């Protein structure tokens, strides 16, 4: 998450000027290395998402294999949305590269097309966020069922994830909904849950669970040599 905050607020916000395609293009060309660092941050984040969904699947599979698989799939969709967002950055930079085959287009047209690719990231993010919130809802439910975490933390995860999914879905249909509920509030509660979960797992670890113990007992019963 920290790498995304860095890329968005220290790089993209500095280079991308709202409502000014020409200024945005000049910033990207003048600070190409910084722009490419932002691209690299996106790729690192995508890699982290895949590692995380794999780890969560392994942890939550004993609780309910089907739901754990569904959550992993939805998180994968979210990761793919981030891949598309990163590819859009590449395409925007290519349009501003000054290559010979682009000289048939006017400069302002190329700048507008580049800004279009950058703007498309907004839509892709919120489509991906819907799937991420759905995945988080399922994972939070599995945390609740597993007793791996304190019940209050798992319940907060379910509520915040459902809230994010509902807000995002309504926003996709009714864009003016952002005037009622600020876009920052869509995923902020869920982000707080994710951070609390991370700190809990880092410092406390997983609680012993009857589900995990039963799963281990079942394995030993099937494999007597492991006793």
Predicted regions, residues:
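Hydrophobic, aromatic-enriched alpha-helical segments typical of multi-pass transmembrane helices
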Residues: 1-227
């Amino acid at each position: 998450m920290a790498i995304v905050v860095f890329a968005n607020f220290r790089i993209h916000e500095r280079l991308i000027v709202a409502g000014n395609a020409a200024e945005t293009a000049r910033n990207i060309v003048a600070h190409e290395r910084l722009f490419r660092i932002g691209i690299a941050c996106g790729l690192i984040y995508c890699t982290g998402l895949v590692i995380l969904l794999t780890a969560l699947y392994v942890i939550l599979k004993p609780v309910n294999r089907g739901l754990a698989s569904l959550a992993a799939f939805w998180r994968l969709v979210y990761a793919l949305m981030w891949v598309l967002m990163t590819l859009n950055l590449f395409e925007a930079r290519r349009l501003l590269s000054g290559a010979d085959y682009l000289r048939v287009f006017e400069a302002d047209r190329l700048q507008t097309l580049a800004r279009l690719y950058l703007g498309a990231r907004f839509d892709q993010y919120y489509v991906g966020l819907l799937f991420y919130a759905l995945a988080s809802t399922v994972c939070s439910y599995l945390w609740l069922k597993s007793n791996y975490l304190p019940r209050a933390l798992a319940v907060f995860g379910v509520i915040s994830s459902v809230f994010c999914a509902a807000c995002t879905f309504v926003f996709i249909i009714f864009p003016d909904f952002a005037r009622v509920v600020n876009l920052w509030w869509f995923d902020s509660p869920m982000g707080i849950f994710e951070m609390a979960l991370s700190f809990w797992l880092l410092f406390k670890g997983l609680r012993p669970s009857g589900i995990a113990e039963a799963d281990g007992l079942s394995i030993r019963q099937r494999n007597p040599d492991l006793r």
